[in-house]
Each structure stands twice: as C-alpha cells, then as structure tokens.
C-alpha cells in the first residue's frame, strides 16, 4: 500500500470469486474498513447482488439482489427450493444477457423461461441474503454423498499455515470420486500434508475430509487471479482409478 495509504480507504468491494470468510476478516482487521461482497457474472452485466451499504452486512454472504433484479434458488426441475436448502441460482432482470453470440444451443440451456441459470449452487436465509455454496460443476459425489469443496476450503483457510487451498474430486474405483486438496503454504510455514488432513478431519463429517492432501509452491491462477482447478498438478499416483 502506497500513499495516500489505508487512511484514505472507506470501503473494500470483493467479487469475481467466493471470498473465504477468514480472508475477509483478515482484510478488515488489516485495513480497518468493511469488505462488501457481491456477486455477478458476465451474463448479468456484471452485478446481480451485493451487501448494500447502509444495510445489514453478513460475512460469507453475497448479499441481496440489486434494484430491478430477481434471484431464486431452484432444483433440477426449476422448482424453488425451501429456505436454507441448496440449489442453483437463477437470475432475471434487465441486466441479463439476451444470449450467447451464434450459440443457440448454449443460449437455450442457460436461458429458460426468462431466467438465467448460473451454474452456481447457493442457499438463501430468512432475510433474503444469498450464500454461495459452490459451482455446480465442482460438486464432488463420494459414494453417493454430496460434498461441496468450498466448505472444506474454508476450513483449510482457517489454518495459519495455509495461503491457498483448492479441493477437487479425484477418480476412485469404488466411490466414484474421492476428496483431494491442493494447498500452498504461507512463506516460512512448516506443516505436513498429513497434519493438514488430520486438521480438517477433526472439523468436518467423516465422509467429507480430504483423504489426499498435497502441497504445491503455488496454485494455478487465471488472468483475474482466480484459482484454476483444472490446471492443478495432481500427483501421478492419484490420477488413475
């Protein structure tokens, strides 16, 4: 941080990827200003919801829909799910695209009955605040159990040695998928993969903790700084069922 320095800050805004609550708290402690998290996609030009200034702010939430925008959480049949249950976010409003250029099939899949299907899984609370659970395509199904990688990543980020974490599904001959976690450590941190595995094991349900943890120098990222899970280097002994 250079001149004029933190004293000039009033608010920080986060978007583009789900912000771990532990990181949000660390930012607020370091800079002494609130971090307001929002949500949107290129198809929603690009904001759909926000933790609005002057309203209640809920860490870990993407807030409530912006003006003239409607959001719902639906199941696979596009029926709205009960409050607190997980489903896919769908969005309707003047900010939603008309379609993908020269991609009619993709447009028909994403836009149904005027609602844009985001591919993001979330839940909504009694106050209408939305909470991202994970990307639909990142869901891990282990022996019939649904596991949301972000839940495990949040636990890893709470460990003082962890700088970056990404949880992915690995092929398994009997279970279909097994839970794996790639981790990058903070400078100077010393901890083993087994110790990290046991740390998570003590905080989540038995079927959720990553059986495989490996430590990398850094996790791959795209141009915007998001971790790119498909580019994560996986140990050779874990890549085949």
List each model region and its residues.
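Conserved adenylate-forming
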Residues: 1-85, 94, 108-111, 174, ...
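General small-molecule cofactor/ligand-binding pocket signal
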Residues: 36, 213-216
């Amino acid at each position: 941080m250079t001149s004029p320095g933190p004293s000039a800050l009033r608010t920080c805004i986060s978007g583009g990827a789900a912000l771990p609550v532990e990181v949000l708290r660390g930012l607020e402690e370091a800079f002494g200003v609130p971090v307001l998290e929002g949500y949107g996609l290129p198809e929603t030009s690009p904001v759909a919801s926000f933790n609005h200034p002057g309203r209640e702010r809920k860490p870990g939430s993407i807030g409530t829909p912006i003006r003239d925008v409607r959001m719902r959480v639906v199941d696979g049949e596009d029926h709205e799910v009960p409050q607190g249950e997980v489903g896919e976010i769908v969005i309707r409003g003047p900010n939603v695209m008309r379609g993908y250029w020269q991609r009619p099939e993709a447009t028909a899949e994403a836009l149904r009955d005027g609602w844009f299907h985001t591919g993001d899984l979330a839940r909504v609370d009694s106050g209408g605040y939305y909470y991202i659970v994970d990307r639909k395509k990142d869901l891990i199904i282990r022996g019939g159990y649904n596991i949301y990688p972000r839940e495990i990543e949040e636990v890893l980020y709470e460990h003082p040695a962890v700088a970056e974490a990404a949880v992915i599904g690995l092929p398994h001959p009997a279970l279909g998928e097994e839970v794996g976690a790639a981790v990058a450590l903070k400078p100077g941190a010393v901890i083993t993969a087994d110790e990290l595995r046991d740390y998570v094991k003590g905080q989540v349900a038995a079927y959720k903790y990553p059986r495989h943890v490996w430590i990398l120098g850094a996790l791959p990222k795209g141009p915007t700084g998001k971790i790119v899970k498909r580019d994560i280097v996986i140990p050779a002994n874990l890549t085949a069922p």
